[in-house]
């Protein structure tokens, strides 16, 4: 199940994200938070010590029983900019970010694993007919 906290003026159909959440974590709640560029910068600075805005952050809650799987925080203005730059829809960009974030909630880590997150992202991207993943874009 997907719970959405949209803190931006962005209007979008989140049906695709609900489908993705049901595939990746069918019995768990995932919180999606859409924030401004400045809010993302504050979160990144305060929680990770990185004083810049990023596109997506994930915060798992696995240590706390009977809570959501975690939160995926997406920088909506940056997603919109990237969608325009890359020539695909905002919904597709948010879906890519959401997949990336949820995989982190599930324990995948592209900086440490041996391609497992990239492989899983690729499978989901094909299944949902989405453009290139974040990991693939970063390597190009």
From Swiss-Prot:
Which InterPro entries does its entry note? Answer: MetalPrtase_cat_dom_sf_prd, YbeY, YbeY_CS
Task: Provide a GO biological process annotation.
Answer: rRNA processing
In which residues is Zn(2+) bound? 100, 104, 110
Task: Tell me which PROSITE patterns the record gives.
Answer: UPF0054
Swiss-Prot/TrEMBL keywords: Cytoplasm, Endonuclease, Hydrolase, Metal-binding, Nuclease, Ribosome biogenesis, rRNA processing, Zinc
- Could you say which cofactors this protein requires? Zn(2+)
GO cellular component terms attached to this protein's record: cytoplasm
Q: What is its EC number?
A: 3.1.-.-
Q: Does the keyword Cell inner membrane apply?
A: no
UniProt-recorded Gene Ontology molecular function terms: metalloendopeptidase activity; RNA endonuclease activity; zinc ion binding
Q: How is the cofactor bound?
A: Binds 1 zinc ion.
Q: Which Gene3D superfamilies match?
A: Metalloproteases ('zincins'), catalytic domain (3.40.390.30)
Protein localization: Cytoplasm
Q: Where are the transmembrane segments?
A: none
Say where the protein is mainly found.
cytoplasm
List the PANTHER family.
ENDORIBONUCLEASE YBEY, CHLOROPLASTIC
Its biological purpose: Single strand-specific metallo-endoribonuclease involved in late-stage 70S ribosome quality control and in maturation of the 3' terminus of the 16S rRNA.
Similarity comment? Belongs to the endoribonuclease YbeY family.
Protein name, as recorded = Endoribonuclease YbeY
What gene makes this protein? ybeY
